[in-house]
Design a protein with these regions (language model features):
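Catalytic cores of nucleotide-sugar-dependent glycosyltransferases that transfer UDP/GDP/TDP-activated
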Residues: 1-190
């Protein structure tokens, strides 16, 4: 989808219908950029003359779909104001921080939110034992349930540590790897 802003402005610039179409590109993870060899342009039905050093679609000698989207979209957003600030730095920008600085007036972080009428621990049907902030005791039953599903023994006074995430560098797993020996000394279940 990152190519749509470019395609609308280039492939379909002859069609007046698209004059009124504005595009917004949302960055969920700047590490997923869609980088391909320049030969990909033909397969994507893009003009070959769009690709040159420092062009709006080129990064380090490759076609970069995300850069194309960032350069041609009318607006850019991401999942939070904090993430928006982070990815404008060389540490987290994955090579596209310069593009984001160039488009800074069209770039916003919009905070993700949770609908607490759905994701509510005392109403959520996906949680076996409902609980509230006033009564956390059913959390022990949920812990027993989860451990039984994973074949682990239940220890009421031992913390259970888990994470739901993609195993990518941006999630900070290098920090866990660096300290795994110390972490394993704790009396915890993983």
């Amino acid at each position: 989808t990152a190519l749509l802003p470019l395609m609308i402005k280039d492939n379909y610039n002859w069609d007046r219908f698209y004059d009124r179409v504005a595009t917004v590109i949302s960055i969920h993870n700047i590490g997923y950029q869609g980088r391909f060899p320049k030969e990909t342009l033909g397969k994507a039905e893009l003009r070959k003359d769009l690709f040159f050093d420092n062009s709006p679609i080129e990064v380090w000698g490759s076609v970069c779909f995300l850069k194309a989207g960032l350069m041609y979209a009318d607006a850019i957003n991401t999942v939070s104001p904090t993430y928006a600030m982070e990815i404008t730095t060389s540490e987290y920008g994955e090579g596209l921080e310069g593009v984001l600085h160039y488009r800074i007036n069209d770039f916003w972080g919009i905070l993700n939110g949770v609908d607490y009428s759905v994701w509510n621990t005392d109403k959520d049907e996906l949680i076996p034992y409902a609980y509230t902030k006033e009564d956390l005791s059913p959390k022990y039953e949920n812990k027993k349930y989860l451990l039984s599903k994973t074949g682990q023994p239940y220890h009421p006074n031992v913390p259970l540590i888990g994470i739901i995430s993609r195993l990518v560098s941006q999630k900070g797993f290098d920090l866990i790897a660096d300290s795994i020996n110390d972490l394993m000394k704790f009396n915890a279940q993983w």
